[in-house]
Amino acid sequence: MLTRKQMELLDFIKTRMDRDGVPPSFDEMKDALDLRSKSGIHRLITALEERGFIRRLAHRARAIEIVKLPEAMERAGFAPRVIEGDRTEPPRGARPVETANALDLPLMGRIAAGLPIEAITDGAQSVTVPSMMLSGRGQHYALEVRGDSMIEAGINDGDIVVIREQQTADNGDIVVALVADHEATLKRFRRRGGMIALEPANASYETQVYPDHMVKVQGRLVGLIRSY
């Protein structure tokens, strides 16, 4: 039997993994459950793990496996989901991209998961992605990640991120942001009054804060591809 907060956290983790392809950060969990500190999230995660609903994967940045779901969630159509950081074997049941229903997306260049770098938008190459990774309508494109500022969001140097092209974002979205019309970066988006905060997911980096007119959202993260 789960408490209300435990159920809320499990539901939030599942929802964000389905939406973004990566688990939420502890800060996002804290904000979503309206808790004052991350210690409360640690206790809830531990309780869910002890009850067999989730499993934390050692030595991987925020990798969480949802082992099972409460009966109420299963009846509503939820299914267990695993996001594992840098595992050496593909997930059980995974199929090669070429045998799945797949589409080619333009690989628009490299995106900085670190300090902003100049945007590269040649689109001369392409990458094949499962069509199920694309979120609804709209244009999509792919970028190669350079840097380690988003590792705690499960995004590593060398990963390919799938981006849905859009010009708006909600607080907490991981976005491609164009700074001062020439530097692109992959960060978590926060609006603070007339300012935009671009947050890393690595304690070694500082949040970048700009006047809102200096930041243009170019797209939102909807998927991630990693070579094993």
UniProtKB/Swiss-Prot annotation:
Enzyme class, UniProt record, top EC level: hydrolase
Keyword Hydrolase applies: yes
EC number from the UniProt entry: 3.4.21.88
Catalysed reactions listed for this entry: Hydrolysis of Ala-|-Gly bond in repressor LexA
Regions recorded as binding DNA: 26-46
Alphabetic keyword roster: Autocatalytic cleavage, DNA damage, DNA repair, DNA replication, DNA-binding, Hydrolase, Repressor, SOS response, Transcription, Transcription regulation
Gene3D superfamilies per record: Umud Fragment, subunit A, Winged helix-like DNA-binding domain superfamily/Winged helix DNA-binding domain
Site location (Cleavage): A113, G114
Pfam families from the UniProt entry: LexA_DNA_bind, Peptidase_S24
Molecular functions (GO terms): DNA binding; serine-type endopeptidase activity
Gene Ontology annotations of biological process type: DNA repair; DNA replication; negative regulation of DNA-templated transcription; proteolysis; SOS response
Active site annotation, chain numbering: S149 (for autocatalytic cleavage activity), K187 (for autocatalytic cleavage activity)
Domain of life per record: Bacteria
Record function comment: Represses a number of genes involved in the response to DNA damage (SOS response), including recA and lexA. In the presence of single-stranded DNA, RecA interacts with LexA causing an autocatalytic cleavage which disrupts the DNA-binding part of LexA, leading to derepression of the SOS regulon and eventually DNA repair.
Assembly behavior: Homodimer.
Protein family membership: Belongs to the peptidase S24 family.
This protein's name: LexA repressor
